[in-house]
Amino acid sequence: MTALFINDEEVTVTPGTSILEACRQHGAEVPYFCYHPELSVAANCRMCLVEVEGWPKPAASCCTPVAEGMKVRTQSEGLEKDRQMMMEYLLIHHPLDCPVCDQGGACKLQDYTVEHGASQGRYTEMKRAVVDHDLGPFISTCMTRCIHCTRCVRFADEVAGTGDMGVLDRGDHMRIEGIVDDCLSSELSGSLGDICPVGALLDKPSHDVSRPWEVTRHKSTCTQCPQGCDITIESRGDEVIRIRPDREGVEPWICDRGRYVYDAFRSDERIVEPKIREGDALNSVSWDDAIGRAVELLKGKRVGILFSPFWSVEGLTAIRLLQDSSFKDAKVAFDLHRRDMRQFAFEEGLAMTTQQIEDVDQVVVLGSDLRQRLPVLMQRLRKRINSGKPVSRIGAMNYRTNTHPTHDALIRPRDWPAVIARAMDQVTEMGKLAAGMDEWRGAVKERHEAGKLLADALMADSCALLVGEEIRSHADAASLIYGLDLLMRACGHAEEGSDGRNLIPEGMNAQLLSSVFGDIRTSAGELFNAAANGELDAMILVGSDPLGDGLFPAEAKQAMGKLPTVQIGAIAGEISQFADVQLPAAAYSEVEGSFINMEGRVRIAGQPLSSIGSERPLWKVMMRLVQAMGGEVPAINLDELRSHVARLAPQLDGVWDAEGEIVIGTARNKGAVFLPSKAKKQGKLDVVSRYSLYREGAWARASELLTDAGRRHALDDVIAHPDTLAAGEHTIRSSAGEKKFNVGNRTNVAPGVLFVAKRGVAGDISSELTVDVDGGAV
């Protein structure tokens, strides 16, 4: 550690720390505009000047590293004059529009002007005015206010990786613009409004809506993806104004999906009253009438239950209590993206924190579009790549990352066994073995050279394996994950403290779901097939919309019209056309509850907002159904319900009373031993379905802000490599029959792969493993 003196007080900091950061860490206030802890140092504003004993002139503290014994002073008469001079320069062209600026009342420029600025300006020349440009749906501009700190430019280059913003001209003509109109393409673009210190870049959806002192701030957890980011919900009354990252949270950024989904809270798609279908219409009724009708449809029937994993821990546990009490033989499913429901050798969830993934020697991404699936984690990997650390990627498509992975390999999904077997061959030659490896690779005849890339990465001292949706949704996923488990154990990456086995889950609470539902779960595809074959009499949907999400929209549409359906949730979605009863459940912003993210971090959230209608927390809806079905209500308050959580998932026992951060480990199943199955008859093309940040999930589709952004990222119906299929209309043959699709061409798709880019259009083939096509070459 390095010892220095700040305002005569001795402090210690890590060597290499800047003076400004040392002052921030120890409570010594130094004004600054251009510095940001997550961005490179620019030293543009010169507001952070400090005096260092023995130095002839003040130093910019943001770019000056500490030294042993250094004596720093942050306040003096000379520094005050310097800061007054810099404020005068910065304010020369800045408009006096604080009363109408969204930043007014929460603006560093205002605060520092009061503290360091003059009461009257001396500049008498013509002030500069800058033309504003439309940057996209999320950011509003007033660039006349810009002080050229370049935070936005550095963010676009270093964090987003898009380079959308740039500096033009110099001197008094200097200006910051987007490269073209409507140019922002990053999944983190909303962060530009957060990092701008002066109100030049503003949040467009909340522009001119409220003043900072009118807003109430509530800490909560975003449930829009497995990352489960810490967020602050800003509201006026019970209306959400904006969502921002929690400053004390793990990640400094949140994605645009988590930031702008809030307009769905008051969407017309919200279920706010109980309803019963009468003819073609769903009509509002009382809770008693709706519950009574649900009991008529469900009691004594063979029931299927399909739910979303994004509910709170308490809500999900209540679903299991309802099943145990009233529907003991029910078929239960919750994963719309998984075909193989056998136990995995390592269950869903991350064994590492995102910081550990950023720091390890090697990272290998297997079959995942992280930019769409987990944009905040992708930012970590982008940061890692930019610092010179390797990231390798194997999959059916070289997904856009706004950076360049160190190594890329394109493969077809049918080649995954050959890739893993090739990696096993190489690590075996290096003398690294695990019991069962010879038997596994002996079951695979083919070899694929992409396995060499995987094996090379595994030979590092530390390695993080990020297993994505291409493997999770594979028909033989259990054997593939067992093969990867063997590789990681052979190479020493499965030990406690260095476990690099990370399986990206579909949603939140993966650790809970494997404990609470692991013994009764089935695949969504099997559930719909059972319904279509007459093996079920009724269906309960809890926050799930299989017509718009997952791999089985065609199967869901065929099955749902054949049986009565009770829909419980916050968003109606496309599946509501089949609902006979709707019961409103409160949104995640309207409940007190617990959530577990993919790292196993337990987040306990209060109730930020009140319900907008007669919605109730999901667990209360479940308990009401238990009572109406004639069962004994197992819990009447959260404390009683949490005792059932602890019984079903012992790893959560006591987390609500514990102090500090709680992390739940990911399950490891030594008995999940599965060898690769023999390939069945396959079609010409392998099918891979796209996950869209702006379209996946009923919440996203109910948000006008996100659907508008999604249109800007629209692709063809399906995509193939030009060597596979020429662009244009083609007839695709599958088990569902023949259908014509508009095929687009991309060279970043593996030959022999048909990439379903628009599931709403091409849902008829999204559940297929392989298909045939007229014409084309493979």
Whereabouts are the PLM-identified features?
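N-terminal export/assembly segments and adjacent metallocofactor-ligating motifs
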Residues: 1-16, 21-24, 36, 51-55, ...
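A cross-kingdom feature strongest in bacterial/archaeal respiratory oxidoreductases
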Residues: 30, 35, 320, 359-365, ...
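Acidic/polar loop patches that form or flank catalytic/metal-binding clefts of enzymes
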Residues: 201-207, 240-242, 305, 331, ...
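Glycine-rich phosphate/diphosphate-binding loops that line cofactor/substrate pockets in enzymes
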Residues: 290-303, 353-360, 450-464, 527-537
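A generic structural motif
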Residues: 329-341, 391-398, 490-512, 566-575
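Short alpha-helices
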Residues: 396-397, 403-436, 477, 590, ...
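Phosphate/pyrophosphate-binding active-site segments
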Residues: 406-410, 417-471
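A glycine-rich, hydrophobic/aromatic-adjacent loop/helix-cap motif
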Residues: 463-532
